[in-house]
């Protein structure tokens, strides 16, 4: 409706090699699909570029204004929100996220799972390597990445479930 020229691609076991990353292979064998998807979203954007959307996202306007950035993300109430973000192919930050996953195991030495939410390493890397300031305001980083305030991508109150339709909002996460 808002981006009719965009192609929607589904990624699954038929077009993604589950064994390409040890963390992913372990999460897949444990049937922890969300952690598989966390890696795949970065893998796809690194290799193809594009805009990632969780399946429970509803666009409310075109993403076209965001394409001027090398990559874009949004702040949430606390940290980053990653059910939607976009990137050109082969960006350094996305490569750094993939490297982070390749250095980790999903099954830790004590047998428990590494269920670190993907926004934790993303925020750490953006702050340490790219100069992000966690002030929840619009920022353009030196590499061409833009970080938007929460009202652009994060409209659902985590405690009440209430959705606020900010004028700046691009999509709603249900």
Language-model segment annotations:
Residues 1-37, 53-174:
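Glycosyltransferase-associated regions of secretory-pathway enzymes
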Residues 39-49:
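Small-residue hinge/turn detector
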């Amino acid at each position: 409706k808002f981006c009719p020229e965009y192609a929607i691609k589904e990624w699954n076991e038929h077009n993604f090699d589950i064994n390409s990353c040890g963390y992913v292979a372990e999460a897949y064998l444990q049937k922890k699909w969300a952690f598989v998807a966390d890696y795949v979203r970065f893998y796809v954007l690194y290799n193809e570029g594009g805009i990632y959307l969780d399946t429970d996202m509803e666009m409310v306007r075109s993403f076209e204004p965001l394409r001027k950035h090398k990559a874009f993300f949004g702040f949430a109430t606390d940290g980053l929100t990653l059910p939607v973000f976009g990137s050109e192919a082969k960006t350094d930050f996305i490569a750094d996220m993939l490297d982070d996953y390749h250095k980790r195991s999903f099954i830790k030495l004590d047998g428990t799972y590494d269920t670190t939410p993907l926004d934790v390493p993303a925020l750490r890397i953006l702050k340490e390597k790219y100069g992000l300031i966690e002030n929840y305001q619009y920022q353009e980083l030196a590499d061409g990445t833009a970080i938007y305030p929460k009202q652009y991508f994060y409209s659902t109150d985590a405690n009440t479930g209430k959705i606020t339709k900010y004028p700046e909002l691009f999509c709603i996460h249900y």
